[in-house]
Amino acid sequence: MNVTKSPAARLGVEQLETRNLLSNATLAVATGILNSPENYSDFVTSEYRHLLGRNPDSSGLSHFLGMLENGVSPETVEAQIVNSNEYVFDHGNTEVGWITGMYQDLLGRNPDANGLNNWLNALANGSSTFAVAAGLVTSQEREVSLIRSDYALYLGRAPRTDEIVSWLSQFQAGANRAQVAVGIVASNEFFALAGKDPSTFITHAYQDVFLRTPSQSEVNFWLSVYNQNQP
């Protein structure tokens, strides 16, 4: 089992650590779990089911897993999926149908007239379909939705306004959704919810991320990572 500690995975961590939100030990474990092949596979499968209404084929799964393992952001993977011929065809093979589908799938609502026209105008003025897809995937509305979902999943509560603003600033500085999730799972609050016990912290992380309980060997592995990153 490999532990991912790429510079990209630590983007924004220094600022968070100065506010006493993270420890190196919980950060190392959270980074490894959320950047694991298992989580990448779960993410791609979930995206296929949600956006394309099917499980990924082996070639598609392998393609996107390779991208994620090479440091491509989850946002880029999601944008590629909604920019695919399959997704466009599933939404009527028209610009209006395609944009409407992305609003519904990514933002949970129909497009307002201004929003729809803005994206149609962008296409008419030469923007690529990928640029439009990426624009919706990385929109502030989408990012706020992801922050709220992560807080509900990992902390069991809604984020405060100042917390939303703080995480949005991380997005604006270049963080992606996986890095934000790492910050939340590595937080003192998540650790406290797990009883401030490293083994329980690992178990809770597995249950929230993978929807399963870790094996004893997995707990032992991540305990060794945790202990290696203690001050």
Tell what function each PLM region has.
Residues M1-A25:
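Subset of Sec-pathway N-terminal targeting signals
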Residues L22-P231:
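Composition-driven recognition of low-complexity segments enriched
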